[in-house]
A protein has these predicted regions:
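Short, solvent-exposed beta-strand/turn "edge" segments of beta-rich domains on protein surfaces
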Residues: 56-63, 127-131
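Short, cysteine-centered beta-strand-loop-beta hairpins and adjacent loop/turn segments enriched
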Residues: 52-56, 75-81, 145-147
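Acidic-leaning, charged glycine-interspersed low-complexity segments
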Residues: 41-44, 94-145
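Extracellular/virion structural assembly segments
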Residues: 61-62, 73-100
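Oligomerization/assembly interface segments of phage tail-like spikes and tubes
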Residues: 62-78, 132-144
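Charge-dense, low-complexity intrinsically disordered segments
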Residues: 2-3, 80, 84, 127
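Small/polar-rich, solvent-exposed N-terminal microdomains that initiate assembly or binding
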Residues: 1-60, 100-109
Length: 147
């Protein structure tokens, strides 16, 4: 069995990078280990990743269910704001990732996606020393099969 973590994160990154925008400005996309301290706001973060082997495989192939959390982050210097901007960017992400079968991420030659689901989405507001950080959390689940 192969580890598909890096592949799925790369494919999601490639799908989002250079495509997301708000008010005519591109929205940067970062992996969880690479957000610069002075990152432009808002930005998208590919966050936690989980994988579970499915017992539905065969002698020739393996199945996995993967979960990837994507965060839309926006900091405001006052006590409120950011929800509408995060909602707009979240909608763009959902339209790009949660597609019909013809638009699924291409994981070939080793894997293919059986199903993509929007597992959950919610908004968090965190007070920080200089204002409020609004985070829109979007979790997608992918059921995949090794070819």
């Amino acid at each position: 069995m192969k580890d598909v973590g890096q592949l799925i994160r790369t494919k999601v990154y490639d799908r989002l990078f250079g495509v997301l925008e708000y008010n005519g400005q591109n929205i940067p996309v970062y992996d969880s280990a690479g957000v610069p301290a002075n990152a432009a706001q808002p930005y998208v973060l590919l966050s936690t990743f989980n994988s579970t082997e499915l017992l539905e495989g065969s002698k020739q192939s393996y199945g996995q269910e993967l979960s990837l959390l994507i965060e839309v982050c926006m900091k405001f210097d006052n006590s409120f704001g950011g929800k509408l901007i995060c909602d707009n960017i979240s909608n763009q992400i959902t339209e790009l990732i949660r597609t019909r079968q013809a638009g699924y991420l291409d994981l070939s030659p080793d894997w293919y996606i059986i199903r993509t689901l929007l597992e959950s989405t919610n908004t968090l507001e965190q007070p920080v020393s200089t204002g409020v950080l609004t985070r829109r959390l979007i979790r997608f689940t992918f059921k995949i099969q090794q070819q």
